[in-house]
Amino acid sequence: MKGIRSNIPRALNAGAKVPCVDNTGAKVVEIISVKKYRGVKNRMPCAGIGDMCVVSVKKGTPEMRKQVLLAVVVRQKQEFRRPDGLRVSFEDNAMVITDEEGIPKGTDIKGPIAREVAERYPKIGTTASIIV
């Protein structure tokens, strides 16, 4: 997994319900924990763009509901700054369901994704239609 050059603020707390924007059948997922999160004692884990999270499917097809899966944050409302000075924010928060290696389980991603996600997870970048 490649490092992200931008300093991404972690805007999504554990317990947040986030829409899933791929065609796997999941509509809304809840963040359970964040992979490779290092925080202090008793601090709730939080995620930002490009972070892989353990999620539970709350709304979706009956086969997908109540499953515990991995997902990557591809959009967040919280503004973040790129090294060239550009500030980027999206209209909504969004996640894509993946496997351990970051390969998306769906074949289509709705809406734009951040360039930082495409750099860290190239397979998500090839699946996405728009990269911002």
From Swiss-Prot:
Keywords noted in UniProt: Ribonucleoprotein, Ribosomal protein, RNA-binding, rRNA-binding
What InterPro entries does its record include?
A: Ribosomal_uL14 (IPR000218), Ribosomal_uL14_arc (IPR019971), Ribosomal_uL14_CS (IPR019972), Ribosomal_uL14_sf (IPR036853)
Concerning Pfam families, the annotation shows: Ribosomal_L14
CDD domains the UniProt entry points to? Ribosomal_uL14 (cd00337)
Q: Single GO molecular-function term?
A: large ribosomal subunit rRNA binding
Could you tell me the superkingdom of the organism this chain comes from?
Archaea
Q: What does the annotation say about its assembly with partners?
A: Part of the 50S ribosomal subunit. Forms a cluster with proteins L3 and L24e, part of which may contact the 16S rRNA in 2 intersubunit bridges.
Instruction: Write out the function statement from the record.
Output: Binds to 23S rRNA. Forms part of two intersubunit bridges in the 70S ribosome.
Family assignment?
A: Belongs to the universal ribosomal protein uL14 family.
Could you identify this protein by its name? Large ribosomal subunit protein uL14
| Lineage summary | Archaea, Methanobacteriati, Methanobacteriota, Stenosarchaea group, Methanomicrobia
Name the gene behind this protein: rpl14
